[in-house]
Amino acid sequence: MSMKGKETMSEQNERIVMGKLGSTYGIRGWLKVFSYTDNAESIFDYSPWYLKLKGEWVEYKVESWKRHGQGYVCKLAGLDVREDAQLMTNFEIAIDPASLPELSEDEFYWRELFGMQVFTTKGYNLGEVTDLLETGSNDVLVIKANLKDAFGQKERLIPYLEEQVIKKVDREARRIEVDWDPGF
């Protein structure tokens, strides 16, 4: 059981946000790119990109990209002048979930954990996964407790430590089993 592709992006309307467009670069429609992927350059492995315009995802092809200073810039097809590109500043870059690599049965993406119910090894329902935090030493599940939690908890932070705390992730049943004291 391993987590692959630790993307810390949100899934919205069947799209997965992988980064954001920054300010323009030059006069020919190039834009700075801020990638949320572990390896920043891998954002360019996904095509097409989707940008949200007036509440709707619109498909764009990356015509070209290059490294610039400490970051990256790209040229989107159809954006040929600075003024058009400026309208895209700060737009989120999303992809279709089908673009992600297939994983083996014991692997999953972080986004799949959102909404899963978390139970102790003794069967107590701790609540639902609402967020994941990267702390440096280990990742942490943020669990929203059930309304009538017997221990009076509203939220729990559970370290994502495979085998030690996380005993099983069942993607099909949308359930995570943990060795955790419900009082914490």
From Swiss-Prot:
Its main location: cytoplasm. One of its GO terms (cellular component) is cytoplasm. GO terms for molecular function: ribosome binding. Keywords: Chaperone, Cytoplasm, Ribosome biogenesis, rRNA processing. One of its GO terms (biological process) is rRNA processing. It is found in: Cytoplasm. The keyword Metal-binding does not apply. Pfam families: PRC, RimM. Residues 104-184 form the PRC barrel domain. Transmembrane segments: none annotated. InterPro entries: PRC-brl_dom (IPR027275), PRC_barrel-like_sf (IPR011033), RimM (IPR011961), RimM_N (IPR002676), RimM_N_sf (IPR036976), Transl_B-barrel_sf (IPR009000). Belongs to the RimM family. The PRC barrel domain binds ribosomal protein uS19. Binds ribosomal protein uS19. An accessory protein needed during the final step in the assembly of 30S ribosomal subunit, possibly for assembly of the head region. Essential for efficient processing of 16S rRNA. May be needed both before and after RbfA during the maturation of 16S rRNA. It has affinity for free ribosomal 30S subunits but not for 70S ribosomes. This is Ribosome maturation factor RimM. It comes from Vibrio atlanticus (strain LGP32) (Vibrio splendidus (strain Mel32)).
